[in-house]
Amino acid sequence: MYTYMEYLQKCFYKTTNWNEDNIFSNITATSSALLEFPIPNGCKVDLSSKATEHSASSFTLSNYHSINGSLAYLYSSIPLRNTMGTKDISLQDAISGFKMLELNSSTTNALQNPVYKNTHDSLLYGRMYFPGSALEAMIIKRISPQTQLLIKCINNPHLDKNGTMIVYLQKNAPKLSREFIYSTNEALFGFRCLYNMGSSESNLNRSINNSNLIPKFDNSVISIGTEIWYAALSMSPGLSTAFRYSTRSTSTGKPLTMTFACNPILGHISSAYTVKTSVASTFCSKYDFNVFSYASNLSLGFEIYNYSSSNTSNSAATPPRIKNSDSQVLSNNSTDSKGTVHIRSPDVLDYKNHSNVIISPIQTFDNYYHINPTLLPSTKNEFEEVRPPPLESQVDSNNETAMTAFENLVNESDFSSVIKLSTSLNDKMLKLLWKGRCKDFLVTTGVKMILNPITNTPEFNRFGISFSYAC
């Protein structure tokens, strides 16, 4: 679940046409959202308010062990008009879950938001924790349409030198993204890059035309990235690489994502497979293995959305609709006392205006077949108007719209709650999370159970509930 400040940050990225999925740190975000989701501990209340289109504030209070809380402020130089409160926000935007990746996401956002002029916008965020004197801050400064500077600071008396600061210089291009990172903690230097390989739009259309009736996967995106770290004070290196394959079925539109991550220094290998089985369900599996210790672990997780009662009742109460062409055919046809259906002549039924209706000139009267000459096309032009489009063009249009239709159905669905469950065989752990609406609040509750290694009995490791309200 996103906090309100995290939600505003994502709205800032969307308004300024910044693609978060093209960053190396988010290459495994889909599997992490389904397997490593946090469980609330104790009782927590989060109240947020957006005073203007440029500023917002948030107040958090919790009673875990002791009463503590925080106060946060956010300012954006660009107006955030695409934000919603907890009453109107969709669960798809409030919860981190499956993401449908696109190769040219920044170009798509630019077409959807042509008002943005790629100016040097910025976002300022700060949070103060109490009791105590812990502070955190974040600054996002856009340098160019594809370059931004991100600075994160933490001030805590329990940390070495009372705090730390991390600076990110990010270059986010559709084909290649790069990050230069510096942290004051042990003078850490880092470099990240992510390269995307995918079929262009022309290749996609060509592949669809070559596979008329064979269901296949296309619109694929292959991302390969790596990160290199070096701590100057401790002289410790770090290296990891990752691979991501995302595609959608041209026949059903359902997306799937596969990731593979490797750390050669530690000998850790991780592979994950995530698929959206339906509009309201997603399944994920992850396998970890260490080549040095031969330790392995299998993790499974899924999420199921529940439709709102109003949406279900409306869909159940609405009878199946009859197309206008079909209803007009039924109304224009007549039935005699014997039950024989007589098709009227074309002067009554204007078949030229119904390209989807094919009227057979062969009719049956008194158990004999007769050809009605008035239903035969008189000229070639009339025949072309009545003739349906070729099968190949129908298949092409269906393939082109299957992916967008499924994506629109997911985004426009009205869900009232979601259930997440994940388990790990090696860790012997089970997590269950529920998030839904209660009046104008978003309620999150969950439990984490582990198996005691000594008594082999299940124990409650974490349990809590959280209430969020934003206006």
UniProtKB/Swiss-Prot annotation:
Keyword annotations for this protein? Answer: Membrane, Mitochondrion, Mitochondrion outer membrane, Transmembrane, Transmembrane beta strand
**GO BP field:** establishment of mitochondrion localization; mitochondrial genome maintenance; mitochondrial outer membrane translocase complex assembly; mitochondrion-endoplasmic reticulum membrane tethering; phospholipid transport; protein insertion into mitochondrial outer membrane
> What does this protein do, in the record's words?
Component of the ERMES/MDM complex, which serves as a molecular tether to connect the endoplasmic reticulum and mitochondria. Components of this complex are involved in the control of mitochondrial shape and protein biogenesis and may function in phospholipid exchange. MDM10 is involved in the late assembly steps of the general translocase of the mitochondrial outer membrane (TOM complex). Functions in the TOM40-specific route of the assembly of outer membrane beta-barrel proteins, including the association of TOM40 with the receptor TOM22 and small TOM proteins.
The record's listing under PANTHER family reads: MITOCHONDRIAL DISTRIBUTION AND MORPHOLOGY PROTEIN 10
Q: What is known of its domains?
A: Lacks alpha-helical transmembrane segments, suggesting that it resides in the membrane via beta-sheet conformations similar to those predicted for other outer membrane proteins and porin.
Q: Which organism is it from?
A: Debaryomyces hansenii (strain ATCC 36239 / CBS 767 / BCRC 21394 / JCM 1990 / NBRC 0083 / IGC 2968) (Yeast)
State the taxonomy lineage.
Eukaryota, Fungi, Dikarya, Ascomycota, Saccharomycotina
What does the subunit section of this Swiss-Prot or TrEMBL entry state?
A: Component of the ER-mitochondria encounter structure (ERMES) or MDM complex, composed of MMM1, MDM10, MDM12 and MDM34. Associates with the mitochondrial outer membrane sorting assembly machinery SAM(core) complex.
Q: Which residues cross the membrane?
A: none
Any idea what this protein is called? Mitochondrial distribution and morphology protein 10
Keyword Cytoplasm recorded: no
Q: How does it sit in the membrane?
A: Multi-pass membrane protein
Q: Which family does it belong to?
A: Belongs to the MDM10 family.
Q: Where is the composition biased (Polar residues)?
A: 325-338
Q: Where in the cell is it found?
A: Mitochondrion outer membrane
